[in-house]
């Protein structure tokens, strides 16, 4: 009888690897440990080529399956938190700006664009990440178009978000550093916003449009399609990736830093130049500009921290020219998630730094809101209610400041000017002025102006 050919046996884990300098012994043990760690990392990332096969699932014990389930649950929890903060927070910001007419200003138009881009990112990009956690591994198949659309939306809205923060910094630069005549008007602001959205659309579309005339793409998993940090270098070239990062991220980052530097310089000089002040309205403006500059700095820091790793990985992939041959690593996934998290951080900054948003979210800061919007709020009320509001505000200032309330007033027309000044120093407000506030505060009660002041976030 002819003997049946036996299948080639699998080498043992301790066998000597080809090209190994020291066969057996400690080298074999280190190799086995490295292979074991690599398999655990593959299970943790999920959606790899052999993760869903029955024989692979049978070969794994209950411990790797438990670790895999815990990793998927943790990732789903993080994505859910980002989704809730981005969607609910940005909806709240947009609702406040649209609801209150006095907030429909130039600066808030840029913030509205930023919130809209973050909201669309949460609604159109995060569902693909949830699908990736539970989709079977292998070829993306019917989800290929959905993955391509998700990557397009993520790129487009990410560029819009970066441009919007740069425009906010530019608006603050023009309002604080430049003379009042150089401030951005409504028409110029709309032109800048339209240019930002069109530029984002133009930079994002070639990722998929330039791919059609080329050779058919190789099959890839949904996970690999979603977390690819740059276009295919073989089709679009490394120059496109570098140009995209420089034009859409690095240049806006430099503009933010430039504006922030000059804002800090101007505020520091103003702190020396404007003392003593003749009216406490100017003191309110000074401290509000200081807090405004701090808020802009916080936004810039988070934008750079969230988008910096992504830009670095795009440049790294462009230099290595090997993005298509490698599966997305943990760094790619973390970098993309950081860009999504930036949209969830911005509403938190607004809620902490702005009394309007915090009041909308249920925090009781009515006095600060009325103080910094006195020229908008009081003319719409009766004279008796105005007097009661002023008296209640004075009493609140005196109770909060104690000894500081005895500070002599810089405004001789009002005995409580020093109190309000000190209260403003303790509780500064976020106020962006488009026009100078009236010097005497009593002019608010005598004039009923039709146009409202700028009190943006």
UniProtKB/Swiss-Prot annotation:
Q: Where is this region: Disordered?
A: 1-27
Ranges annotated as spanning the membrane: 65-85, 110-130, 157-177, 190-210, 236-256, 296-316, 330-350
| Locations listed in the record | Cell membrane; Endosome membrane
- GO BP: G protein-coupled receptor signaling pathway
Q: Does the record's keyword annotation contain Transmembrane?
A: yes
Q: Which residues lie on this side of the membrane: Extracellular?
A: 1-64, 131-156, 211-235, 317-329
Q: According to the record, which residues are glycosylated?
A: 47
Domain of life of the organism in this record? Eukaryota
List, alphabetically, the GO terms of the cellular component aspect. endosome; endosome membrane; plasma membrane
Q: What is its main location?
A: membrane
Molecular-function GO term, any one: G protein-coupled receptor activity
Q: Which InterPro entries match?
A: GPCR_Rhodpsn, GPCR_Rhodpsn_7TM
Look up and give the membrane topology term: Multi-pass membrane protein
PROSITE patterns in alphabetical order: G_PROTEIN_RECEP_F1_1, G_PROTEIN_RECEP_F1_2
Tell me which UniProt keywords the record has, alphabetically: Cell membrane, Endosome, G-protein coupled receptor, Glycoprotein, Membrane, Receptor, Transducer, Transmembrane, Transmembrane helix
Q: Which residues lie on this side of the membrane: Cytoplasmic?
A: 86-109, 178-189, 257-295, 351-457
Q: Which family does it belong to?
A: Belongs to the G-protein coupled receptor 1 family.
Please describe the quaternary structure of this protein. Answer: Interacts with MTNR1B. Interacts with ARRB1 and ARRB2 in a spontaneous and agonist-independent manner; leading to the internalization of GPR135 in the endosomal compartment.
Role: Orphan receptor. Has spontaneous activity for beta-arrestin recruitment. Shows a reciprocal regulatory interaction with the melatonin receptor MTNR1B most likely through receptor heteromerization.
This protein's name: G-protein coupled receptor 135
Gene for this protein?
Gpr135
């Amino acid at each position: 009888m002819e003997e049946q050919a036996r299948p080639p046996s699998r080498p043992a884990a301790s066998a000597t690897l080809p090209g190994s300098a020291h066969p057996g012994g400690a080298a074999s043990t280190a190799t086995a440990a490295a292979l074991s760690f690599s398999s655990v990392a593959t299970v943790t990332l999920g959606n790899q080529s052999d993760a869903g096969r029955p024989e692979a699932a049978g070969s794994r014990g209950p411990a790797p399956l438990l670790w895999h389930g815990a990793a998927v649950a943790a990732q789903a929890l993080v994505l859910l938190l980002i989704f809730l903060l981005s969607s609910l927070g940005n909806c709240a910001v947009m609702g406040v700006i649209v609801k209150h007419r006095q907030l429909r200003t130039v600066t808030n138009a840029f913030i509205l664009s930023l919130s809209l881009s973050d909201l669309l990112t949460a609604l159109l990009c995060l569902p693909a990440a949830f699908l990736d956690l539970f989709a079977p591994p292998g070829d993306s198949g019917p989800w290929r178009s959905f993955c391509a659309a998700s990557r397009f939306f993520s790129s487009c809205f990410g560029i819009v978000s970066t441009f919007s923060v740069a425009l906010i910094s530019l608006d603050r630069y023009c309002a604080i550093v430049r003379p009042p005549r150089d401030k951005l008007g409504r028409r110029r602001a709309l032109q800048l916003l339209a240019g930002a959205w069109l530029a984002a659309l133009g930079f994002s579309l070639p990722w998929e449009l330039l791919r059609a005339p080329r050779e058919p793409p190789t099959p890839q998993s949904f996970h690999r399609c979603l977390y690819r940090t740059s276009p295919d270098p073989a089709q679009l070239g490394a120059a496109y990736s570098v140009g995209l990062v420089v034009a859409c991220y690095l240049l806006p980052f430099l503009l933010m830093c430039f504006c922030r530097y000059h804002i800090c310089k101007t505020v520091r000089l103003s702190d020396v130049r404007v003392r003593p002040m003749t009216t406490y309205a100017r003191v309110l403006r000074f401290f509000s500009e200081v807090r405004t500059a701090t808020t802009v700095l916080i936004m810039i820091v988070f934008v750079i921290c969230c988008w910096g790793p992504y830009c670095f990985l795009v440049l790294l992939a462009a230099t290595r020219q090997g993005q298509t041959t490698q599966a997305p690593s943990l760094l790619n996934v973390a970098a993309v998630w950081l860009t999504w998290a930036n949209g969830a951080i911005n509403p938190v900054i607004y809620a902490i730094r702005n009394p309007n948003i915090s009041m909308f979210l249920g925090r009781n800061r009515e006095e600060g809101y009325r103080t910094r919007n006195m020229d908008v709020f009081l003319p719409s009320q009766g004279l008796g209610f105005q007097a009661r509001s002023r008296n209640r505000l004075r009493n609140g200032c005196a109770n909060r400041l104690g000894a500081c309330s005895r500070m002599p007033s810089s405004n001789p027309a009002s005995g409580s000017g020093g109190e309000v000044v000190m209260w403003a120093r303790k509780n500064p407000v976020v106020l962006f002025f488009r026009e100078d506030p009236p010097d005497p505060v009593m002019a608010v009660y005598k004039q009923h102006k039709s146009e409202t002041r700028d009190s943006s976030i």
